[in-house]
Amino acid sequence: MDTPTPQSRLDTLAAAYWEAYLETYPLFATSVGDRRYDDRLADPSDAGVAGARARFAALQDEADSLGADALGAVPLDEADAPGGPDRPGGAPELDAAARVTLDALRESVSADIAQLDAGLLAWNIDPIEGVPVDFLNVPDYQRLQSPADGHHMVARWCAMAAYTDEHLASLRRSLADGRVACRAPADRTTAILAEILGTPTEDWPLLAPLAGLDALPGWSPVERERFAAALWAAVNDEIRPAFARLHDALVTEILPAARPAERPGMCHVEGGLEGYRGLIRVHTSLDLDAGELHRIGLDEIARIDSELGELAGRTLGTRSLEDALAALRGDPALYFTTRDETYEKAASSLARATDAIPAWFGRLPEAPCEIVRMGPHEEVHSTIAYYRQPAPDGSRPGQYYLNTSSPRTKPRYEAEALAYHESIPGHHLQIAIGQELPHLPEFRRHLGPTAFFEGWGLYAERLADEMGLYTGDLDRIGVLSFDAWRAARLVVDTGMHALGWPRDRAIAFMHAHTALAPDNIANEIDRYIVLPGQALAYKTGQLEMLRLRTEARVALGAGFDIRDFHDTLLGSGALALPALRGIVSAWVEHRTPGSASTPSS
């Protein structure tokens, strides 16, 4: 038997990692169109988490072994940038493109392990991505076409009850060990549970698939009747009681012992500070400490405050940041009045961006983007917007989910920047392009560091101004407010989780430096409490992308082409920031007069 080549080993390993990831996270598998796990959920038990970690650790060991063999024992993060000369003493048997894949795989597996080691699953109560909201959104993307799909759906719905009970058991075990969630976001989850439990079962989102059942071909009357009865029983007899048990336990057991608003951060949980350090690496893809990120945030806030003062002087008649923010928050004319207005503004912004992108990007996605209003079960306690990737098989477009609740609290001047971040040229453009790169292994089409995804979204907000997409100076004030918002995240996330800030101090900092509405600020701070480190990705990624663009423009001069630069940034999938720098450096070198190298991905 022939000895496997490094390339064949890498191909096998990349496929094995993708399979392990889909099996570990079945809801993600469904969201990207893989239907094999539509009947199950992730295993949140201690044994399930340990099993997932063991799978990822075995893959990490294999990737490290391959790296040592293929790169002549040169650690991958010390190897030359793609397209550059080989290191002395290390004769790589993987070409530059394959080395990027190996680097990405090691980065991704390491992040998976760090996420599990942080231990959040055991004690965290997440009103944004946890029970029950995560489950209530599943009908939006789980397919129901055939009777077999119906069997899978019923099985998964029943698994939701078991998952909820296991989640409660974990919360109780953690409470006994002295690890407990922060009160403020836990209150939000309790309110969401109370709201859904107060809703008649027939109106639950989990029964929405029944509305279109009669129109589905290939079902006999008996199959329709059995499925409808089984789905109803799963929701009414399994999930509803499980949600009620969780709600009651939160009220009587967890909330009375929850950490107060004075101690919201991971640093107040045993082992939390170490876990937070790991999450910084996960979300930024860089070896930065909390203090350094905190300082970067403060520096960015100072710069943006100055820019905002100058623009406010021209637009609002005051250069005082405090007065400008008060004017932005206090003028009802600057806010929407109806839900439809909020939606229509997003739609018109998306349409303008769609028309403009061919001048700025050579590669465009085939998948379209649509705007979807958040459902009532999530909008009150959710963020202002989020994005869901398209189904790779074309059955679902990319979706920009918009929170249209309480329109009088939603500023008009922020709506355009929000749309460009979530849709085009932001998340939709980047994620849809990544999914449509046929030369990449599956995991690179769908996974990647938060710093790349969110860094691109924030980069896109500023790019939209260069593209001429903003209507006026008030909308540009919205851009600066959003930029300050992301810079403030560096300050408040590290402030709470590493430096011990109370929740009120984080809220006050956001209020002093952004034009965000008070309700939005409170929602955001509670989001950072339950998703530690995630908020660090935005500014970290944006700043690196801006640096790369500036360096490339200086190096290439008149030879710099913005379309080629953007195609280079997005043409290799979502990469760790050091790997992205290597890709851009190779592209610049290839275009430098006299260079014989070629770019790679």
Regions picked out by a protein language model, each given a short descriptive name:
Residues M1-S601:
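N-terminal maturation segment of proteins
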